[in-house]
Amino acid sequence: MKATQFILTALLSMTYLSVFSQTNFGEPKDSTNFKTEINPDFFLLGTLSDYMGRFQYVDREKQIDRYYPYEESIAKYIAKFIKENYRIVVNTVFITSRHSEIFSPKLAKEIHTKYFDEKGRFIDSTLNSEVKKYSFLTGVYYRYGEHLEGNIYKIQVANSPKDKEIYQILKDLECDKLVYKFLRGYIPSSDIFYLEATPRMIKYFNIIGQEKQELQKSYDSYIGKIFEGEQGAKAKVMSNDRQKELIKSLQLIFK
């Protein structure tokens, strides 16, 4: 009863909430002998920031990306990933605030020419194979995702045109159980996808499991500063309780 009441409250309070699904709720594809393969371009593309558009804050000619202080681990990982997969040593710049940026004119020209049009929009037609879609989704999960419980995951992007690619990929890869929430009226506005990941998706997510845990730990530590002090401690308890209720509701929806 309590979970049902929460769902009703959530439905009334959310600006926009929908449950997307395929027409069939069949058995997920077998993953026992399924082999994962990462396409470097599309994994990297999945991680890229595009707040207010890909080139609003990123230099198209020479920059790969920019990162928040809590994303130091991903900046270092991406620099290493590029060196191993492209044989390019990037220029990683850390400023006093611990924000960071990665530069490589050669790689920037390559990926921005191949995968973005003249107006800076991602070329969707390049996502033309399962390997590319899984690779892109894995990159998105690494930077923008969260493992909530069991096979339930969350992906959240802010003021990003990437939302349409995320939804289409989840649909194409037969993610039948998906809840979408749009936070309208917030700064920034956000698109949130709650999903029950398929066994094949989980295999891909596990590739980056250790790195994701490190990033999540850094994020939690960064956000934890908000909950310092007596009032902060109370707010943290309330936040944790809401998270537990959310997970219960998602479990009920996905049942």
Question: What is each residue range found by the language model?
Answer:
Residues 1-26:
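Bacterial Sec-dependent N-terminal signal peptides
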Residues 23-46:
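Short N-terminal segments immediately surrounding and downstream of signal-peptide cleavage
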Residues 23-31, 107-123, 247-254:
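Short amphipathic alpha-helical segments and their helix-coil junctions
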Residues 57-61:
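Acidic/histidine-rich, surface-exposed loop or edge segments in extracytoplasmic proteins
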Residues 209-255:
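Extended mid-to-C-terminal alpha-helical interaction segments
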